[in-house]
């Protein structure tokens, strides 16, 4: 049975993951840190994150949001790429190159590392570190 991880830090988050998910998320954590070392690791909204930017929430409050975040979901792992350019969300624009994954506007969902095209993910991460943001 899936049990959502509740944590107060990335270290706590990783420690609470089941072994199979922990291996995947630790790999992605290292991959992001290697390919975007300028994005400071953080822990926002119960997710390990990398880099952050300010945006106005629905109540017009100024919030910190991660540029990239990773999360263990019930049936897959999600990598959130909160980055845009004039054509919209970066993840969505690269969905055909990312491998055997499901892609939403800013979310890349996959079950195994082998499903990801790591070269394409690296490209998306490197664009994200230069263009963080959300389409509002």
Model-derived features: positions:
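Charge-dense, helix-prone N-terminal extensions
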Residues: 1-136
């Amino acid at each position: 049975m899936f049990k959502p991880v509740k944590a107060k830090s990335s270290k706590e988050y990783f420690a609470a993951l089941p072994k199979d998910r922990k291996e995947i998320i630790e790999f992605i954590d290292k991959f992001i840190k290697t390919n975007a070392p300028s994005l400071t690791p953080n822990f926002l909204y119960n997710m390990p994150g990398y880099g952050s930017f300010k945006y106005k929430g629905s109540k017009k409050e100024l919030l910190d949001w991660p540029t990239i975040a990773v999360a263990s979901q019930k049936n897959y792992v999600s990598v959130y790429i909160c980055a845009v350019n004039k054509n919209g969300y970066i993840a969505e624009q690269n969905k055909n190159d990312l491998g055997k994954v499901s892609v939403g506007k800013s979310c890349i969902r996959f079950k195994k590392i082998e499903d990801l095209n790591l070269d394409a993910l690296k490209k998306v991460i490197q664009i994200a570190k230069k263009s963080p943001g959300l389409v509002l």
